[in-house]
C-alpha cells in the first residue's frame, strides 16, 4: 500500500463478515488487540486501511491529429465506482467490477491541454453481498484504484461498438452480429461496406498467422445513432475451420472495418458447450470438468492481475495437476485471463461478482437486482466471444425468498441474449 488511511484496530470497518468472535473476546488474544500490536488472524493485514473516495487529476494534451475525432478514456479495471470530469464538466460514472470503464470525453474537443479528473470510490456503492470475492477483504482485499491499461483513445465519430461471433460447429461456420454507433448522427441513411478479415491467432505470442483465412464485405448503414447488423457466413467460404477444445485450442481473430477507418477485432473459437443428460458436452462429445476454485487470491499485489504472464502461471499450474476448469468464485477475471484460457484450452466458469445472502438478497427489489442485470450485460459484451468462457452464474449461494424466481428469469434472459454458453442460478 501507500500508507494512506487509518491504522488497523479492532474497529477497522472491513468489507466482509467475521463469524469467529474469539479474537475480539478471548484473553489469550488480548495482546494482539492492543493498539500498535494489532494482528488480524482472518486474512492478510494491510498496514493501513482506507475506504472512501480517492481523487486523481492531471493535464492531458490532445494532438492535432485527434481534431474532429471521438476521444475515449479507457480504464481497464477499477475498484470500484469511477466518476470522470473533463475541464470541470461531468462526463459520467461507472460501477462495473468486472469490465473496463470507458468514457466518451467528447467528439469535438479542440487539440491542446485539458484537465482530466477521475474519482475512485471503494465503498460498497451497491450491496452485492459483503463476502463477495469481487469486493471483500477476505481474499484480494478492498483496494482502491485502477489497474491495467489506462489509455486515451481516438476513433472516428462512427465506430463499431459491439461485435459478436456465434459459432456453428456442425456447419463449420459462424454468424456475425454487432452494432455501429454514431456520435453525431445526421438522420440520413448512409450506406457503406464493412470488411471482415478472418485469421488464425497464435495466442501464445500474440501474433496473427498469415495470410487471412478469408476476406468478406457486407453493406452497412452509418447515418443513424445505433445500427445493428448480422450476417451468416456461408460455410463454403470457410473451408478448413477447426473446432476449439482443451485438446485442440484453435483460436481465430475476426476484424471488422468501416470505410472511415474504424475497426474492431475479436478473438473466438469454433466451439459448442452444452449438456446431454447429466453430462457436459464440448462440440457434441461428452466431457468432464476437472476443476478448482479461483477466489481472487493474489496476496503479493492485493488485486487481480491484468497481464498475460500472471494468468499463464495460474492456468499452467492447474493443467499440471490434470485440471481443465476454473471456477471464478463470486468474481470475474479481466481480459488477459480469457486470452490465456483460450490459448491453453481451459474451460472457465465465471460469476458476476455477487454473493447475495448475508448482507443482501436477490429478487426483493434491492439495488443488487438492477446492478446484476447491468453487470451481466457488460460481462457478455466484453468477454462473450472467448471460447474458454463456457459457464456464467450470477455468483455464489443466493439468498432471499424470491431468489429462485428472479434467477430463473435471469437465466432465461441470458440464454435469449447470448446462447453461446451455459447459465445457472447459483453455485455453492
Predicted features, each with a name:
Residues 325-428:
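Substrate-binding/catalytic cleft of secreted carbohydrate-active enzymes
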Residues 1-328, 340, 345, 375, ...:
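Secreted/periplasmic carbohydrate-active enzymes, especially glycoside hydrolases
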Amino acid at each position: 500500500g501507500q500508507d494512506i488511511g487509518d491504522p488497523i484496530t479492532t474497529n477497522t470497518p472491513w468489507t466482509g463478515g467475521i463469524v469467529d468472535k474469539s479474537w475480539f473476546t478471548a484473553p489469550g488474544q488480548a495482546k494482539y488487540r492492543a493498539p500498535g500490536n494489532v494482528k488480524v488472524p482472518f486474512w492478510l493485514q494491510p498496514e493501513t486501511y482506507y475506504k472512501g473516495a480517492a481523487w486523481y487529476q492531471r493535464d492531458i494534451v490532445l494532438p492535432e491529429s485527434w481534431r474532429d475525432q471521438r476521444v475515449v478514456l479507457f480504464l481497464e479495471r477499477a475498484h470500484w465506482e469511477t466518476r470522470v470530469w473533463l475541464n470541470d464538466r461531468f462526463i459520467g460514472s461507472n460501477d462495473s467490477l468486472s469490465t473496463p470503464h470507458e468514457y466518451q470525453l467528447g467528439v469535438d474537443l479542440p487539440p491542446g491541454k485539458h484537465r482530466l479528473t477521475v474519482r475512485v470510490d471503494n465503498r460498497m456503492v451497491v450491496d452485492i453481498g459483503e463476502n463477495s470475492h469481487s469486493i471483500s477483504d477476505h481474499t484480494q482485499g478492498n483496494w482502491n484504484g485502477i489497474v491495467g491499461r489506462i489509455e486515451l483513445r481516438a476513433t472516428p465519430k462512427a465506430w463499431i461498438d459491439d461485435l459478436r461471433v456465434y459459432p456453428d460447429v456442425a456447419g463449420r461456420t459462424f454468424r456475425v452480429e454487432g452494432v455501429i454507433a454514431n456520435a453525431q448522427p445526421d438522420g440520413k441513411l448512409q450506406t457503406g461496406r464493412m470488411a471482415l478479415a478472418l485469421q488464425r491467432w497464435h495466442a501464445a505470442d500474440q501474433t496473427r498467422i498469415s495470410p487471412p483465412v478469408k476476406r468478406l464485405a457486407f453493406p452497412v448503414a452509418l447515418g443513424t445513432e445505433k445500427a445493428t447488423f448480422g450476417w451468416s457466413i456461408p460455410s463454403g467460404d470457410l473451408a478448413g475451420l477447426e473446432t476449439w477444445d482443451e485438446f485442440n485450442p484453435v483460436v481465430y481473430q475476426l476484424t471488422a472495418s468501416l470505410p472511415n477507418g474504424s475497426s474492431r477485432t475479436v478473438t473466438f473459437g469454433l466451439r459448442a458447450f452444452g449438456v446431454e443428460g447429466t453430462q457436459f458436452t464440448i462440440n457434441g462429445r461428452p466431457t468432464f470438468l476437472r476443476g478448482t476454485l479461483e477466489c481472487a487470491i493474489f496476496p503479493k499485489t492485493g488485486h487481480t492481475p491484468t497481464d498475460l504472464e500472471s494468468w499463464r502461471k495460474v492456468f499452467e499450474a492447474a493443467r499440471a495437476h490434470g485440471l481443465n476448469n476454473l471456477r471464478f468464485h463470486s468474481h470475474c477475471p479481466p481480459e488477459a485471463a480469457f486470452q490465456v484460457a483460450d490459448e491453453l484450452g481451459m474451460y472457465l466458469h465465471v460469476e458476476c461478482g455477487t454473493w447475495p445472502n448475508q448482507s443482501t438478497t436477490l429478487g426483493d427489489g434491492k439495488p443488487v437486482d438492477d446492478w446484476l442485470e447491468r453487470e451481466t450485460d457488460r460481462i457478455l459484451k466484453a468477454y462473450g466471444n472467448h471460447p474458454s468462457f463456457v459457464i456464467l452464474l450470477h455468483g455464489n449461494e443466493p439468498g432471499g425468498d424470491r431468489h429462485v424466481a428472479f434467477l430463473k428469469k435471469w437465466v432465461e434472459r441470458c440464454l435469449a441474449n447470448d446462447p453461446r454458453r451455459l447459465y445457472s442460478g447459483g453455485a455453492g
